[in-house]
Amino acid sequence: MKYKERILSLLAVPTRFAKFYLFLLLFLGLSFLSIYFVYKKIGGNSFAFDKQLISFDFLTYILILLFLYFLFDGLRLYFVLRSINEKVPFKDIFKLVFINIFISNVTPLATGGGFVQIFYLTKNGVPMGKASAATLIRTFLAVIFLFVSAPLIVIFSKSEQFASFLTDNIYTYIIIILALYFLAFYVVVFKKRYICCIVYLFLRLLRKMHFISHRRFCRYKFKSIKQIILFSKSLAWFLKGDIKFVASSIFFTFMFLMSLFSFSAIILWELSYAVGYFDIVGLQVVITFLMYFAPTPGASGVAEGAYSVLFSKFVSQNDITLVTLSWRFFTIYIGVFIGMIVLYRDLFRKGKKR
């Protein structure tokens, strides 16, 4: 009976986050179908595992790169927070790295990642306005790099490697989503009055529908406007912040992206493909850029499809499925698995305290 109760208690803790686990199943299902598509259509029904990918040297390089990848991801948020005069213990930031990877990869358009970061930062004493600003700045630093460099790489590419993948319909879709991204950033950064009006009208609607009392309406209105103003000030604080913290946040954002792009290089070189590092980085920039517009959880389908099509130019049919699967495994699946465990343990610990 004890064991039965123990199992039931373990399963009961995450029910508040049940939708994330449903999204996880969707993510896994789409990932499986995507890899199968690569195997059938790009790989020509051929697959062979290479023992080089379990060699001691390869695993050593990958483990070092994984550590740096997660470390740089944590440091870029840590220094953004320091630049707006907030200090959160790095161990809490490092835990948040994995939770964010899990949530952002199992929710459409990575929408859950930002919210979970704000939630955990506020739990660590960061005001919601500052937590929202830090999350936005962290994302925007990476977005600037990708949204500027990816179009330039496509435009000035000497080969026709992007022509078969980037059709007119995809270009139209990207332009529309890109415009919406920048419109949202513009409103959030420069038009805080619009946000205040939207929040006010929403609270007023709740009041008219008697979901909240007049007292709560006044309190929520005051708190919301206060946090929006704090959010706006935090963006200014970042631009005027301590140069060493601002520079560090930009530097570690760049290092995070370069570590992300380096997984493919190690995989291909281990399989004896003589491909230049910057050729690999160029393709990875475009693929990561496209993943920002994928509506599926974790960009499943889009990521594998774009990767296999672009890298099939110099990877054999026999290896393309293995290379694509290895890339997703090291850059996404491991982080998602660790994040799921970290989130589960965090919820279970809170459940025990109650």
Please provide the spans of the model-predicted regions.
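Membrane-interface helix starts
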Residues: 15-22, 53-61, 236-251
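A short amphipathic helical element positioned immediately N-terminal to and/or at the very start
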Residues: 45-51, 121, 227-240
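Transmembrane helical segments that form the transport core of multi-pass membrane transport proteins
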Residues: 235-286
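Membrane-embedded helical hairpins/re-entrant loop segments and their flanking transmembrane helices
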Residues: 74-98, 267-283
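Hydrophobic/aromatic residues in alpha-helical transmembrane segments
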Residues: 34, 73-80, 99, 117, ...
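Alpha-helical transmembrane segments of multi-pass membrane proteins
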Residues: 91-100, 278-289, 319-329
